[in-house]
């Protein structure tokens, strides 16, 4: 299980646990699973997908960076919105 926090200048959008995360990085789509090697990657403008069991939550990100270290994922974005409503 991963602990993930998604934050913007306006506050925290998501803080919880997920099975895995999918982002659009500069090198293409990237999945983060439990025990992934630590990374810091810029995130392309697009969707962040959070999956827990059968539930999928999407956020649309702009100007974001992701850090994964020891199963703790932090996404810091200049702008983000609920992607399930776009």
Which sequence ranges carry the predicted segments?
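Compact, glycine-rich, soluble single-domain proteins
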Residues: 2-86
């Amino acid at each position: 299980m991963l602990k993930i926090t998604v934050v913007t200048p306006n506050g925290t959008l998501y803080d919880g646990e997920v099975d895995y995360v999918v982002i659009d990085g500069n090198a293409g789509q990237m999945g983060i699973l439990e025990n992934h090697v630590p990374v810091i990657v810029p995130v392309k403008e697009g969707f962040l997908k959070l999956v827990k069991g059968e539930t999928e939550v999407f956020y649309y990100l702009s100007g974001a960076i992701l850090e994964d270290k020891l199963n703790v994922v932090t996404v810091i974005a200049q702008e983000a919105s609920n992607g399930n409503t776009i």
